[in-house]
A protein has these predicted regions:
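Rossmann-like NAD(P) dinucleotide-binding subdomain of oxidoreductase/dehydrogenase enzymes
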Residues: 1-137, 268
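Conserved sugar-transfer catalytic core signal across GT-A, GT-B, and GT-C glycosyltransferases
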Residues: 32-34, 208, 296
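A short hydrophobic/small-residue beta-strand
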Residues: 43-45, 219, 308
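ALDH superfamily catalytic-core signature
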Residues: 95, 103-248, 272, 277, ...
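A structural signal for short, well-ordered beta-strand elements
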Residues: 131, 198, 264-269, 290
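Glycine-rich nucleotide-phosphate-binding loops and adjacent flexible coil segments
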Residues: 261
């Protein structure tokens, strides 16, 4: 305010929002989109991946049970061309929220026109471990961030950059841990890595494993070998936790988002080298830094070109 004027900003609901969620963590990403959308007074049309429709259907049932009026949260099922694209292009849709692949995200931006939109797209996140890091905690986190959820996560720490002085030790311990990961029935609570989402995606992951060996990276475990599975799931889309060491950051397996349990271990010399490797990528979704130095943590986090940086 001023002596003669009162200025303020007034926020209004935008209207109908198209919310497009992926298959890898379908319930969580749906709730992340739906909750703030409805809380601010908008209505939502939720379109799930055709590969994971059931959790959204259950979310719709729960919404009705909770008393959300009919028509406030709406569900659309189908393929992108038949369901997603018409939704994005519809004249009554005022905003679009999409989580998924970079390729599809580019298409949505083109189709959305002047609508408001938010995107969370692909990633090839650097997981940087300096030689002063808490080794055991960094090892635990590195294993978790690439192999949990089958490696099918956009924030997976798939490029593991390790300082040369601890690189050999880290490789040995990381491979030891990877070999112990239980692969099998997703309904078994002891299972860590379950099946890939589809046969097409399994073929993609296996293609990159073959490519890594052809490019000259050292395959230390996993690969194309078939896991020992219970009879009930033998026909599933399984791939073993796979570790490539001595990866050159220019290799395709280091540059492309594989979206599976495939780790690329890359040595670095010093802080400047680590930052250069971390930023030598087309993606910039997330990053991870492990160090006991507060100053280094702030420097590296600021220098890495990523939307999120998690320290220790």
């Amino acid at each position: 305010p001023t002596p003669t004027h009162l200025n303020y900003t007034l926020f209004h609901p935008v209207g109908v929002c198209a919310l497009i969620s992926p298959w890898n963590v379908p319930f969580m990403t749906s709730t992340w989109k739906v909750a703030p959308c409805l809380a601010f007074g908008n209505t939502a049309v939720l379109k799930m991946s055709e590969l994971s429709p059931m959790s959204a259907a259950r979310l719709g049932e729960l919404a009705l049970e909770a008393g959300i009026p009919p028509g406030v949260l709406n569900l659309v099922h189908g393929y992108g061309k038949e369901a997603g694209e018409p939704l994005v292009r519809h004249k009554d849709v005022r905003a679009v929220s999409f989580t998924g692949s970079t390729l599809t995200g580019n298409r949505i931006v083109q189709a959305a026109g002047l609508k408001k939109f938010s995107m969370e797209l692909g990633g090839k996140s650097p997981f940087v471990i300096f030689d002063d890091a808490d080794f055991e905690r960094a090892l635990d986190a590195a294993v978790f961030m690439i192999f949990s959820n089958n490696g099918e996560r956009c924030t997976a720490g798939s490029r593991i950059l390790v300082q040369q002085s601890i690189y050999a030790k880290f490789v040995d311990r990381f491979v030891e841990r990877a070999k112990k990961i239980r692969v099998g029935d997703p309904l078994d609570e002891q299972t860590i890595v379950g099946p890939m989402i589809s046969k097409a995606h399994l073929a993609k992951v296996r293609h990159y494993i073959e490519l890594g060996s052809k490019e000259g990276a050292s395959l230390l475990c996993g690969g194309l070998a078939q896991p020992d599975l219970p009879e009930r799931v033998k026909r599933g889309n399984y791939v073993l936790p796979t570790v490539f060491a001595d990866v050159d950051n220019r290799m395709q397996i280091a540059q492309d988002e594989i979206f599976g349990p495939v780790a690329c271990l890359i040595p670095f010399k010093d802080e400047a080298h680590a930052i250069a490797l971390a930023n030598d990528i087309q993606y910039g979704l997330s990053s991870y830094v492990w160090t006991e130095s507060v100053g280094r943590a702030h420097r590296v986090a600021a220098a890495i070109e990523a939307g999120m940086c998690f320290v220790n």
